[in-house]
Every structure is written in C-alpha cells, then in structure tokens.
Regions:
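A conserved acidic beta->alpha catalytic loop
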Residues: 37, 41, 49-61, 72
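Well-ordered beta-strand positions
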Residues: 44, 66, 89-91
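Catalytic-site signature of metal-activated, phosphate-bearing donor transferases
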Residues: 2-9, 17, 77-84, 90, ...
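N-proximal low-complexity "stem/linker" segments adjacent to membrane-targeting elements
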Residues: 1-37
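Conserved donor nucleotide-binding strand/loop of the catalytic core
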Residues: 57-82, 86
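A short acidic, amphipathic alpha-helical/loop segment
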Residues: 33-34, 59, 82, 108
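Acidic helix N-cap motif at the loop->helix transition within catalytic regions
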Residues: 29-32, 54-63, 104
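Conserved hydrophobic beta-strand within the GNAT/NAT acetyltransferase core sheet
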Residues: 22, 44-47
Length: 160
C-alpha cells in the first residue's frame, strides 16, 4: 500500500458520478483489495456475483458494495451487461477482482471524466507475472450510455 497522500476529489455535486462495475465468482482472496483500491474514489460499487461458493459476497458487502447475483451465463458479455444495467453513475469503471486502480491514476481520471466530449477512456493495464508484454490497453472507463454494451464472450470490450 502506498503512503502517498491521495489527491483531493472535487465534491460529488461538482463532478460526474462514477460507478464501479465488477463481475465475480469465488474471488474471496482478491476482492477486498480491488474494492479498497477504488473506495472513496467511486460513488458506488456494484458487484455481480455469478455463483460464488466462498465468502466473496460477504466480503464485497462488508466493503460497501451493492451485490446482485445471477447464474453464470456461459460467457462474459451477458454478465458484464447485466452488471452495467445495475450501475447508476454517469461514468462506469470496470475492474476484475484481481485488478487494482493505482492511487496516482485518480486525479487524471477525474479530469478526463469531466470532459463532455469523451465517451470511452482507454486504460493501461499492467499484468504482474505476464510471460509476454505485461502491458495492454483496455477500454474499462466509459460514459454510461445505452449504446455501449459488451459484445465478446472472452476479453469483452465495449468499443468493438
């Protein structure tokens, strides 16, 4: 955990509302750190559980997330779209339970979501332990809009 002070956030009334959307299954070992990485940054945390048999749901609720559930639909797109239906923010940040938002990313992201001309923001993801390049671009921050939906069964994207 970094000891750097977090940048001050403008009051929620002065900026777009930001929601976290996450789908999970049996992520009890990882979900707390993922949710902690966005706590105080997002205005709501929505977790869609797809059939956990461990303490994932209880941990997410303890961290302040709104938790819903559905049976695993067979691919990621329908699950991500269902989670997207549950969020209420103007912008949606999508994380997996094994991902973290770095504290130094908060201020620049707040500046970007305040820009009315932007619809989708591509983030740089660093994968620890990757055998090939540890970096990849992912479209995981976007304005909530009825036309934006997930479309692939794996490595689902909203910008296809």
């Amino acid at each position: 955990m970094s000891s750097l002070p977090l940048p001050e956030q403008p009051p929620a009334a002065e900026r777009p509302r930001l929601s976290l959307s996450m789908i999970v299954r049996d992520e009890a070992e990882r979900i707390e750190a993922a949710l902690a990485s966005v706590a105080g940054f997002v205005d709501e945390m929505v977790v869609l559980d797809t059939g956990s048999s461990d303490d994932t749901v209880a941990i997410a609720e303890r961290c302040g997330a709104v938790v819903a559930s559905m049976p695993w639909p067979g691919d990621f797109a329908p699950a991500r779209n269902r989670a997207l239906e549950l969020v209420r923010g103007d912008w949606v940040l999508v994380l997996d339970a094994d991902e973290r938002l770095r504290p130094e990313a908060r201020a620049p992201l707040l500046e970007l979501i305040a820009r009315p001309e932007l619809l989708v923001i591509t983030l740089l993801r660093e994968e620890e332990g990757a055998l090939q390049s540890p970096y990849s671009s992912v479209s995981r921050l976007f304005r909530r809009h009825p036309a934006l939906r997930w479309s692939r069964p794996y490595h689902a994207m909203v910008d296809d």
